[in-house]
A protein has these predicted regions:
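C-terminal "post-core" interaction segments
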Residues: 27-41, 58, 79, 151, ...
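Alpha-helix termination/capping residues and helix-transition junctions
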Residues: 20, 175-177, 238
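Hydrophobic alpha-helical segments, principally membrane-spanning helices and signal/leader peptides
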Residues: 9-10, 169, 191, 258
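Flexible, low-complexity junctional segments that flank or bridge functional domains
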Residues: 26-181, 185-215, 222-229, 243, ...
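Bacterial Sec-dependent N-terminal signal peptides
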Residues: 1-34, 351
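Generic hydrophobic-segment detector
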Residues: 8, 14-16, 181, 281, ...
Length: 351
């Protein structure tokens, strides 16, 4: 009996071993082919099923398929395929959408290229911040100083620069004597939203609802979860209690857009400058059969009124750089913020 059981056991093992290659071949047959057409279809399907703004942006993705599929040929080069796929992704008008290969990365940059710059780094660096050795301080990517009129100034160039609570304690302690504060996030293309939350938490004394987020739950364009609230918790450490102006332009994007949205919910904060660039979708990454990766917006973020902020956030006070000021090395937006904080300038409804 024992020998019979052993024989049956060995037969079962042999049958399983024989079947495994067949199972593997079945799985491979279901996979998308690593060909120009296969990679095109894979990319189109990823966006069709997972991109979160197709309905909001009123994009006919089926029509986009028809438009670009006719450009795909079996003999096209890798560079040619990349160009077609990159152009197709640009139809989404989303700065969070990139196609990355070994030889190139696609970008959509019309969200800021078609707008005024409203920022001159050389003017800020040379005529407002001054010399790094003597005129301003730097802590974890934040440059800060006290202007001669007792207005504090913080310049944060990227939310990718990590900022700790110890850094913020030192910065706010140093700026404490100031009568008002300017936070300049113009040309800040984003980074880590944890940093935006950590800074914003220094400007509220109570929990504040700042927005909502939804997640994809299915392949349909409108398959989303219920909205989940996003709340800003006040910091347990030093908190700023005086008036604050946040400076923005079209290149304020992604995590910066998130920061501006949070700050706009706070009572002592005024947003000044130009409309932000947007970028409210939480990015996600997927891979094509040929190994190229695609990044895209997968979860939409809304403001506290459940309004989309993908296209950007309007400032409370619209101010553009003045060309005459620029020739004199004057930053119009900084000067308006200083005058506003000192009570020397009351803006009209639309500047």
């Amino acid at each position: 009996m024992k020998n019979d059981k052993m024989v049956r056991f060995l037969k079962n093992i042999l049958v399983l071993i024989a079947v495994l290659p067949l199972l593997g071949s079945c799985i491979r047959e279901d996979e998308v082919a690593n060909s120009p057409q296969g990679n095109f279809e894979a990319l189109w399907k990823i966006i069709d099923e997972q991109y979160c703004f197709l309905e909001y942006k009123q994009i006919d993705w089926d029509a986009i398929h028809d438009k670009y599929s006719r450009l795909i040929t079996g003999s096209m080069s890798s560079e040619g395929l990349f160009e077609v796929l990159g152009n197709m992704l640009n139809e989404l008008q989303d700065g969070h959408v990139n196609l990355a290969s070994a030889h190139n990365v696609s970008y959509y940059d019309a969200w800021y290229q078609d707008y005024p710059r409203n920022f001159r780094e050389d003017i800020v660096e040379d005529f407002y911040l001054g010399k790094a050795s003597t005129d301003y301080r730097t802590a974890a990517g934040i440059k800060y100083k006290i202007f001669e009129d007792n207005i504090g100034y913080m310049r944060y160039e990227s939310f990718s620069s990590g900022i700790g609570n110890g850094n913020l304690d030192e910065i706010l302690s140093y700026l404490a004597p100031c009568s008002g504060l300017i936070i300049d996030v113009r040309n800040n293309g984003g980074g880590n939203v944890t940093n935006s939350e950590r800074i914003a938490a220094r400007f509220t004394n109570e929990k504040v609802l700042t927005g909502y987020i939804r997640h994809k739950t299915g392949k349909g364009h409108n398959d989303f979860s219920k909205p989940y609230p996003i709340e800003l918790e006040p910091s347990n450490s030093i908190r700023w209690q005086k008036k604050t102006v946040v400076l923005t332009n079209r290149r304020s994007y992604s995590a910066t857009n998130d920061f501006v949205n949070q700050m706009s919910c706070l009572p002592n904060v005024t947003i000044m400058g130009d409309k932000t660039g947007g970028g409210s979708g939480m990015p996600f990454t997927s891979e094509l059969p040929n190994g190229w990766t695609v990044r895209f917006s997968a979860s939409p973020h809304f403001n506290a009124d459940m309004e989309q902020i993908e296209w950007g956030i309007e400032p409370d006070i619209k101010v553009n750089m003045d060309e005459t000021d620029e020739t004199k090395h004057i930053d119009t937006i900084i000067e308006k913020a200083r005058a506003f904080l000192k009570g020397e300038w009351t803006p009209a409804v639309s500047e």
